[in-house]
Amino acid sequence: MADQLTEEQIAEFKEAFSLFDKDGDGTITTKELGTVMRSLGQNPTEAELQDMINEVDADGNGTIDFPEFLTMMARKMKETDSEEEIREAFRVFDKDGNGFISAAELRHVMTNLGEKLTDEEVDEMIREADIDGDGQVNYEEFVTMMTCK
């Protein structure tokens, strides 16, 4: 995972890691993580901080070392890529660019993809994704639909 990072990214992350690693011992503790999160305006609980550490703490020692930090950052960057992909997909469906996917736009794209859907099926797809009930799908609803697997 971390081997897909450029040298520039690794250098950037090393700098960020140093900001977290207040005492310079090469590891980030929950206390150090909390300090940085609070300086960024977040207010995580002790349990949340522990969860964040546990998620990337590969060797189970309760702290994050630099390789574990790199893995975490690489993972986060991967998530950002998929957000960009979702945005692109939304643009494909939103033919007129008004920020909403209508039943007609959905039908058009699905037909181009070789999916012959009845009006009922198209309406059903819109209904499933249409959280606010306005009869069309906005970007937030589209993201929710795409990420709720």
From Swiss-Prot:
Q: Which Pfam families match?
A: EF-hand_7
Give the residues the record marks as binding Ca(2+) 3.
D94, D96, N98, E105
Q: Which domain of life is it from?
A: Eukaryota
CC per GO annotation:
myosin II complex
Q: Which residues bind Ca(2+) 4?
A: D130, D132, D134, Q136, E141
Residues that hold Ca(2+) 1 according to the record: D21, D23, D25, T27, E32
- Using the record's annotations, give every residue carrying the modification N6,N6,N6-trimethyllysine: K116
Q: Name one GO molecular function term.
A: calcium ion binding
Domain EF-hand, by residue range, is: 8-43, 44-79, 81-116, 117-149
Instruction: Reply yes or no: does the keyword Transmembrane helix apply.
Output: no
Residues found modified as N-acetylalanine: A2
InterPro entries referenced in this protein's UniProt entry, alphabetically: CALM/Myosin/TropC-like, EF-hand-dom_pair, EF_Hand_1_Ca_BS, EF_hand_dom
Which keywords fit this entry according to its UniProt record? Acetylation, Calcium, Metal-binding, Methylation, Repeat
* Coiled coil (UniProt feature): none
**Which positions are annotated as binding Ca(2+) 2?**
D57, D59, N61, T63, E68
Please report which protein family the annotation says this sequence is part of: Belongs to the calmodulin family.
Its UniProt miscellaneous note says:
This protein has four functional calcium-binding sites.
Q: Tell me, in a sentence or two, what this protein's role is.
A: Calmodulin mediates the control of a large number of enzymes, ion channels and other proteins by Ca(2+). Among the enzymes to be stimulated by the calmodulin-Ca(2+) complex are a number of protein kinases and phosphatases.
Supply the name of the protein. Calmodulin-B
* UniProt source species: Halocynthia roretzi (Sea squirt)
